Regions:
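Conserved ABC ATPase "signature" region
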Residues: 116-134, 308
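Hydrophobic anchor residue at the start of the ABC signature
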Residues: 152, 180
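ABC ATPase C-loop
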Residues: 155-156
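Conserved catalytic motifs of ABC-family nucleotide-binding domains
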Residues: 159
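Conserved beta-strand-loop-alpha-helix hinge in the C-terminal portion
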Residues: 215-253
């Protein structure tokens, strides 16, 4: 259905191509998941399918991308609208009408379909996506999952054979994401639509994919295969697959259900195992003290003895820092003698006659 033949894409001002040597085929009627680290060109690859690359984004596209026999380099996006539908991360950025029903009909109006055909397809899409009760609702009042379903419905009414989605659930909560994924499964299994999608939250999608395309690095050739096999070599994988890799399970689990099935033998092995003994921490040595002097509390084993010198009357010992230089300052002079009390004898003197 989708054929990439030695496809490379280079944008102006970049030293290396974003895509290089892409040569693969996406079969018809399958859900194919595109994975890889950020910045490897996933959105660029999706854009070559819809014709947005290079017609809108610019850049140099070499090689050939064909969808249903049409070359996307020689066919502009409007000439592919009846064949390829595109849904992005933010549906609000693509809506052009105010209500659900009008949005579903807009794409068909642009293609010039007959009014009776438009009405029939709108009703079919409302029922397929569970939007019948929302047909007259303003789009701005819908939840995130409902808006994404409307966005998918708006590109389904022209009956495209290919649906391209760029992280359709990344901005949705888990409940809304489940709504969107349920719709995609119905499109693949009930209508035979070919779905090519990139998704950051792999734990939500990977168990539903028929095949996975891995872009390991910018400009690197992609790798395509079954999800469990690709997850073994992918630099990004869902947590449950990471657990299976650490436990040595083969094939890797792609869902919690798969992990529970694969954990049966692990539970049996751990049933008779005793927990490892915790290593005892040795007691720190007692602090040493100077002979005949009390110790100063400090780090274990490193008590500091107090100075042996005693303070003397009439002398001030300055506290000197570590970096002080030069001789110590002279001692302070002794205090003057105290005068005798008025009307009394002075200190050590005789009482006046």
């Amino acid at each position: 259905m989708i054929r990439f033949e030695r496809v490379s894409v280079r944008y102006e001002g970049t030293e290396r191509p974003t895509l290089s040597g892409v040569d693969l085929t996406v079969p018809e009627g399958e859900l194919v998941l595109l994975v890889g680290p950020s910045g490897v060109g996933k959105s660029t690859l999706l854009g070559t399918v819809s014709g947005l690359v290079p017609h809108f984004t610019g850049g140099l596209l070499s090689g050939r991308v064909t969808v249903g026999g049409r070359d996307t380099r020689t066919h502009k996006p409007r000439e592919l609208a009846d064949l390829v539908g595109t849904v992005g991360q933010d549906p609000l950025a693509h809506f052009v009408t105010d209500t659900v029903e009008d949005e579903l009909a807009y794409g068909m109006e642009s293609l010039g379909l007959a009014p009776d055909v438009m009405r029939r397809r709108v009703e079919e899409t409302l029922d397929l996506l569970g939007l019948a009760e929302l047909r007259d609702r303003p789009i701005a009042t819908l939840s995130g999952g409902q808006q994404q379903r409307v966005a998918i419905g708006s590109v389904l009414t022209p009956h495209p054979r290919v649906l391209v989605l760029d992280e359709p659930t990344s901005a949705l909560d888990p409940a809304a994401a489940e709504e969107v994924l349920a719709v995609l499964q119905r499109l693949v299994h009930d209508l035979g639509t070919t779905v090519l999608m990139a998704e950051h939250r792999l734990e939500r999608v990977v168990q539903y994919a028929d095949q996975v395309v891995l872009l390991p690095a910018p400009g690197a050739a992609p790798v395509m295969g079954p999800p469990a096999e690709i997850m073994k070599v992918s630099p990004v994988r869902p947590p449950v697959a990471e657990l299976g890799l650490l436990a040595g399970w083969d094939p890797l689990p792609l869902s919690v259900r798969d992990a529970r099935r694969g954990a049966g033998g692990l539970r049996e092995r751990l049933a008779d195992a005793s927990p490892p003994e915790t290593a005892s921490v040795p007691e720190p040595p007692a602090p040493r003290k100077a002979p005949g002097e009390p110790g100063m509390p400090g780090m274990p084993g490193a008590a500091v003895p107090v100075a042996a010198e005693r303070p003397r009357t009439g002398r001030v010992a300055p506290l000197r820092g570590r970096g002080a230089r030069g001789p110590p300052p002279p001692p302070a002079p002794p205090p003057p003698p105290r005068p005798g009390r008025r009307g009394g004898a002075g200190r050590g003197g005789a009482r006046p006659a």
